[in-house]
Amino acid sequence: RIKPNGDLNYSFPVELAELLKDSSVFAKLDLEVMKSFSSKYAFALYEEISRRIGLSYKMTEELDVQELRDLLGVEDGKLITHHNLRAKALEPALSEVNAITPYQVTIIPKKKGRKVISFLMGWSIKDVEGMKEAHAELQRPKIGRKDRLSGASSSVVES
């Protein structure tokens, strides 16, 4: 609201105010990137990597299975098997984060026998060429991104 003397008063909704309190994270998140995610798991991974990217002493982290599920925001009782977790949450999140953000993220499963016991997560900032590619993908429509990233061909059909 603008007062007669020219002062401008404004307020933030409570939810946004809570988010802004943690300005160290919010300042690192790019609104354009955040709006471009189609996966909630990609958004969660992007937020967590943004928190870690400035750590000069750490570029990898080992996570047990539950820690990775928590990091991605996978709800309890959902995506129970490793196959489902990988196919429905982890791979789409990695694909999207690596395609449209300035970060390069890898998450490698560590096994004991056939069982996955933990994950090694690594992150870095892309080089100039990688940044250009991410920016170019960010400018393209969301529709068809999944096919572009997987290498599947898609075409528009005239009716």
What feature does the model see in each segment?
Residues 1-159:
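Charged, alpha-helix-forming regions
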